[in-house]
Protein backbone atom coordinates (compact mmCIF):
# COMPACT_ATOMS: atom_id res chain seq x y z
CA UNK A 1 0.00 0.00 0.00
CA UNK A 2 0.86 3.69 0.00
CA UNK A 3 1.99 5.38 3.20
CA UNK A 4 1.51 9.17 3.35
CA UNK A 5 4.25 11.49 4.51
CA UNK A 6 5.06 15.19 4.47
CA UNK A 7 7.99 17.53 3.94
CA UNK A 8 8.15 19.67 7.07
CA UNK A 9 11.05 22.07 6.54
CA UNK A 10 10.48 25.63 5.30
CA UNK A 11 13.34 25.81 2.83
CA UNK A 12 16.78 27.33 2.86
CA UNK A 13 17.58 30.76 4.29
CA UNK A 14 20.88 32.69 3.98
CA UNK A 15 23.34 31.62 6.66
CA UNK A 16 24.33 34.57 8.90
CA UNK A 17 27.82 35.86 8.06
CA UNK A 18 27.98 33.52 5.05
CA UNK A 19 25.15 34.66 2.75
CA UNK A 20 26.18 32.43 -0.17
CA UNK A 21 25.31 29.40 1.97
CA UNK A 22 21.91 28.23 3.18
CA UNK A 23 20.58 26.85 6.44
CA UNK A 24 17.17 25.19 6.52
CA UNK A 25 14.39 26.79 8.55
CA UNK A 26 11.23 25.36 10.06
CA UNK A 27 12.06 24.25 13.59
CA UNK A 28 9.83 26.88 15.22
CA UNK A 29 6.51 25.25 16.05
CA UNK A 30 7.59 21.95 14.51
CA UNK A 31 6.64 19.85 17.54
CA UNK A 32 3.03 21.02 17.34
CA UNK A 33 2.88 20.61 13.56
CA UNK A 34 4.20 17.05 13.78
CA UNK A 35 1.47 16.10 16.24
CA UNK A 36 -1.13 17.47 13.82
CA UNK A 37 0.40 15.56 10.88
CA UNK A 38 0.46 12.32 12.90
CA UNK A 39 -3.20 12.82 13.87
CA UNK A 40 -4.03 13.27 10.17
CA UNK A 41 -2.43 9.92 9.36
CA UNK A 42 1.10 10.79 8.26
CA UNK A 43 3.64 7.98 8.62
CA UNK A 44 6.87 9.75 7.75
CA UNK A 45 8.42 13.19 7.44
CA UNK A 46 11.25 14.72 5.42
CA UNK A 47 13.71 17.55 6.04
CA UNK A 48 16.33 18.74 3.54
CA UNK A 49 19.60 20.48 4.28
CA UNK A 50 21.51 21.95 1.32
CA UNK A 51 25.30 22.03 1.05
CA UNK A 52 26.86 23.80 -1.94
CA UNK A 53 30.40 23.30 -3.22
CA UNK A 54 32.80 25.97 -4.48
CA UNK A 55 36.49 26.51 -3.83
CA UNK A 56 35.69 28.28 -0.54
CA UNK A 57 32.52 26.55 0.68
CA UNK A 58 31.02 24.68 2.43
CA UNK A 59 32.17 26.17 5.70
CA UNK A 60 32.12 24.10 8.86
CA UNK A 61 29.48 26.48 10.18
CA UNK A 62 27.13 25.62 7.30
CA UNK A 63 27.60 21.88 7.70
CA UNK A 64 27.17 22.08 11.48
CA UNK A 65 24.05 24.26 11.31
CA UNK A 66 22.32 22.03 8.78
CA UNK A 67 23.30 18.82 10.58
CA UNK A 68 21.94 20.22 13.84
CA UNK A 69 18.64 21.09 12.16
CA UNK A 70 18.36 17.63 10.63
CA UNK A 71 18.97 16.02 14.02
CA UNK A 72 16.42 18.23 15.82
CA UNK A 73 13.87 17.40 13.13
CA UNK A 74 14.59 13.67 13.36
CA UNK A 75 14.32 13.60 17.15
CA UNK A 76 11.03 15.51 17.14
CA UNK A 77 9.63 13.28 14.39
CA UNK A 78 10.41 10.10 16.29
CA UNK A 79 8.93 11.61 19.43
CA UNK A 80 5.70 12.09 17.45
CA UNK A 81 5.77 8.49 16.21
CA UNK A 82 6.85 9.41 12.68
CA UNK A 83 9.74 8.04 10.61
CA UNK A 84 12.15 10.86 9.65
CA UNK A 85 13.78 10.91 6.23
CA UNK A 86 17.04 12.76 6.82
CA UNK A 87 18.14 14.54 3.63
CA UNK A 88 21.58 16.19 3.64
CA UNK A 89 22.07 17.12 -0.03
CA UNK A 90 25.49 18.07 -1.34
CA UNK A 91 24.57 19.85 -4.55
CA UNK A 92 26.01 18.74 -7.89
CA UNK A 93 26.04 22.33 -9.23
CA UNK A 94 29.55 23.41 -10.18
CA UNK A 95 32.73 22.23 -11.85
CA UNK A 96 34.13 20.26 -8.92
CA UNK A 97 35.66 16.81 -9.25
CA UNK A 98 34.17 13.62 -7.87
CA UNK A 99 37.01 13.60 -5.32
CA UNK A 100 35.88 17.00 -4.02
CA UNK A 101 32.30 15.75 -3.76
CA UNK A 102 33.56 12.71 -1.83
CA UNK A 103 35.37 14.96 0.64
CA UNK A 104 32.38 17.25 1.24
CA UNK A 105 29.88 14.40 1.41
CA UNK A 106 32.02 12.58 3.97
CA UNK A 107 32.37 15.73 6.10
CA UNK A 108 28.65 16.36 5.93
CA UNK A 109 27.51 12.84 6.77
CA UNK A 110 30.04 12.53 9.58
CA UNK A 111 28.56 15.63 11.24
CA UNK A 112 24.98 14.55 10.56
CA UNK A 113 25.45 11.22 12.33
CA UNK A 114 27.31 12.90 15.19
CA UNK A 115 24.36 15.24 15.68
CA UNK A 116 21.83 12.41 15.38
CA UNK A 117 23.67 10.62 18.19
CA UNK A 118 23.74 13.79 20.30
CA UNK A 119 19.95 14.01 19.95
CA UNK A 120 19.41 10.32 20.80
CA UNK A 121 17.85 9.56 17.42
CA UNK A 122 17.22 5.84 16.90
CA UNK A 123 19.03 5.14 13.63
CA UNK A 124 16.97 1.98 13.19
CA UNK A 125 13.90 4.19 12.90
CA UNK A 126 15.01 6.63 10.21
CA UNK A 127 16.05 6.69 6.56
CA UNK A 128 18.94 8.57 4.98
CA UNK A 129 18.28 10.45 1.74
CA UNK A 130 21.72 11.54 0.49
CA UNK A 131 23.27 12.59 -2.78
CA UNK A 132 25.39 10.17 -4.74
CA UNK A 133 29.08 11.05 -4.90
CA UNK A 134 29.26 12.72 -8.32
CA UNK A 135 31.33 15.04 -10.45
CA UNK A 136 29.99 18.58 -10.65
CA UNK A 137 27.32 19.06 -13.31
CA UNK A 138 29.55 21.50 -15.22
CA UNK A 139 32.69 19.38 -15.00
CA UNK A 140 33.75 18.39 -18.53
CA UNK A 141 35.12 15.05 -17.29
CA UNK A 142 32.13 13.41 -15.65
CA UNK A 143 32.77 10.21 -13.72
CA UNK A 144 31.39 6.93 -15.04
CA UNK A 145 28.58 5.04 -13.30
CA UNK A 146 31.12 2.51 -12.03
CA UNK A 147 33.26 5.25 -10.48
CA UNK A 148 30.19 6.90 -8.96
CA UNK A 149 29.29 3.57 -7.37
CA UNK A 150 32.82 3.00 -6.06
CA UNK A 151 33.12 6.48 -4.54
CA UNK A 152 29.60 6.49 -3.12
CA UNK A 153 29.90 3.11 -1.40
CA UNK A 154 33.43 3.89 -0.16
CA UNK A 155 32.22 7.17 1.35
CA UNK A 156 29.21 5.60 3.05
CA UNK A 157 31.25 2.72 4.46
CA UNK A 158 33.29 5.35 6.32
CA UNK A 159 30.45 7.28 7.89
CA UNK A 160 26.99 5.65 7.62
CA UNK A 161 26.36 3.24 10.52
CA UNK A 162 25.07 -0.24 9.72
CA UNK A 163 22.11 0.46 12.02
CA UNK A 164 20.59 2.69 9.33
CA UNK A 165 18.12 0.35 7.58
CA UNK A 166 17.91 2.14 4.27
CA UNK A 167 19.55 4.70 2.02
CA UNK A 168 17.17 6.29 -0.49
CA UNK A 169 19.10 8.35 -3.00
CA UNK A 170 17.96 11.70 -4.33
CA UNK A 171 18.46 12.28 -8.06
CA UNK A 172 19.68 15.84 -7.48
CA UNK A 173 19.44 17.17 -11.02
CA UNK A 174 20.95 14.18 -12.80
CA UNK A 175 19.38 13.27 -16.13
CA UNK A 176 16.85 10.44 -16.06
CA UNK A 177 19.32 8.03 -17.67
CA UNK A 178 22.22 9.08 -15.42
CA UNK A 179 20.17 8.65 -12.25
CA UNK A 180 19.07 5.18 -13.36
CA UNK A 181 22.52 3.98 -14.49
CA UNK A 182 24.21 5.24 -11.33
CA UNK A 183 21.61 3.60 -9.08
CA UNK A 184 22.06 0.33 -10.96
CA UNK A 185 25.86 0.45 -10.56
CA UNK A 186 25.59 1.30 -6.85
CA UNK A 187 23.26 -1.64 -6.20
CA UNK A 188 25.44 -4.05 -8.18
CA UNK A 189 28.45 -3.04 -6.07
CA UNK A 190 26.40 -3.01 -2.87
CA UNK A 191 25.30 -6.59 -3.50
CA UNK A 192 28.86 -7.64 -4.34
CA UNK A 193 30.28 -6.32 -1.06
CA UNK A 194 27.19 -7.23 1.00
CA UNK A 195 26.49 -3.62 2.01
CA UNK A 196 24.59 -3.41 5.33
CA UNK A 197 21.89 -1.01 4.08
CA UNK A 198 19.06 -1.26 1.58
CA UNK A 199 20.00 0.98 -1.38
CA UNK A 200 16.91 2.47 -2.99
CA UNK A 201 15.68 5.74 -4.49
CA UNK A 202 13.56 8.74 -3.64
CA UNK A 203 13.55 10.55 -6.97
CA UNK A 204 11.62 13.61 -8.06
CA UNK A 205 13.14 14.96 -11.25
CA UNK A 206 14.85 11.64 -11.95
CA UNK A 207 11.42 10.11 -12.56
CA UNK A 208 9.45 13.10 -13.81
CA UNK A 209 11.55 15.20 -16.19
CA UNK A 210 10.76 13.42 -19.45
CA UNK A 211 7.15 12.85 -18.39
CA UNK A 212 6.50 16.53 -17.68
CA UNK A 213 8.19 17.57 -20.91
CA UNK A 214 5.99 15.20 -22.93
CA UNK A 215 2.83 16.26 -21.12
CA UNK A 216 3.46 20.05 -21.29
CA UNK A 217 0.06 20.66 -19.70
CA UNK A 218 -1.85 19.39 -22.75
CA UNK A 219 -4.62 16.82 -22.30
CA UNK A 220 -3.86 15.19 -25.65
CA UNK A 221 -0.38 14.28 -24.36
CA UNK A 222 -1.52 12.54 -21.18
CA UNK A 223 -1.41 8.96 -22.49
CA UNK A 224 2.07 9.34 -23.98
CA UNK A 225 3.30 11.01 -20.79
CA UNK A 226 1.91 8.16 -18.68
CA UNK A 227 3.69 5.63 -20.91
CA UNK A 228 6.99 7.47 -20.47
CA UNK A 229 6.53 7.66 -16.70
CA UNK A 230 5.71 3.95 -16.46
CA UNK A 231 8.80 3.07 -18.53
CA UNK A 232 11.10 5.21 -16.36
CA UNK A 233 9.59 3.84 -13.15
CA UNK A 234 10.17 0.27 -14.37
CA UNK A 235 13.79 1.04 -15.28
CA UNK A 236 14.45 2.72 -11.94
CA UNK A 237 12.82 -0.13 -10.02
CA UNK A 238 15.05 -2.60 -11.88
CA UNK A 239 18.11 -0.43 -11.11
CA UNK A 240 17.23 -0.57 -7.41
CA UNK A 241 17.71 -4.34 -7.66
CA UNK A 242 21.03 -3.97 -9.54
Annotated model-derived regions:
Residues 19-33, 58-73, 106-107:
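Glycine-rich anion/phosphate-binding loops
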Residues 1-5, 34-42, 75-79, 118-123, ...:
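Acidic (Asp/Glu)-rich catalytic clusters
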Residues 15-18, 49-62, 90-96, 137:
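Glycine-rich, proline-tolerant flexible connector loops at the mouths of alpha/beta enzymes
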Residues 39-48, 70:
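Hydrophobic alpha-helical segments and helix pairs
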Residues 70, 83-84, 88-96, 104, ...:
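Conserved anion-binding
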Residues 44-49, 81-91, 121-131:
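Short beta-strand segments at enzyme active-site cores
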Residues 1-41:
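Active-site cofactor/substrate anionic-group-binding motifs, chiefly glycine-
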Residues 96-242:
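Active-site capping/gating regions of soluble enzymes
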Amino acid sequence: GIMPGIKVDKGGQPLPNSPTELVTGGLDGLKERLKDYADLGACFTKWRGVIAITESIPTNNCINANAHGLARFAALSQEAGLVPIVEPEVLMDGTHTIERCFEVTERTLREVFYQLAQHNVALEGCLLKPNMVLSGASNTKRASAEEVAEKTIACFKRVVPAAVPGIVFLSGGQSDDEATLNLDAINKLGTKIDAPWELSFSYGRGLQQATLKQWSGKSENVTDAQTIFYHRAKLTSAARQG
